[in-house]
Amino acid sequence: MRDICMHYGGLTRPSQTASSQISLLGENFQVHYFTGTSLPCLSVFKPIYFEGGVPELGERPTNKYSSKNYWWRFEVLHRKIQTNYRTYIADFLKDKNELQLKIIEKEVDFRKKYLEGKVDKCELSGLTKWAFDEEEKLLEKWNDIVKVGKLPLFYSMNWGRVNKKAGLIF
């Protein structure tokens, strides 16, 4: 594997990263940051605690597009950004990285309070839900901003075929 973040690239790279995880495994406490979405370079890592669980994320994913599915809602934005990458990437990453830092800072504070006995398991699940909700706001904002651009011919043909098979039309 050449990269941690593997973007679909047609014949030379016929698949892409589906989800990513970073785990902090302390002796007294573990937190697992998951994207739950493709392309970690464009995704937000959310803290998930086995003690707290995962919030409801909509219908289960399949290989067909559904606006009711968490993964597909983000996949639409990821694919739109790729069609106009240079136009949007700097501003998008600024917003995404600011949110990521906010999530990390809040998680570090919660973890400290949990270890001190000041936060219970219910509050851990609340932090996870808050992180997903904040990410959803980022998605809504950027789906409104990003306009579909034009990809190089062969790359566009490959993505067109993949999108058509999934029932995804821009």
Regions found by a protein language model. Give the residues of each.
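C-terminus-biased signal that marks the final domain/tail of proteins
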Residues: 1-170
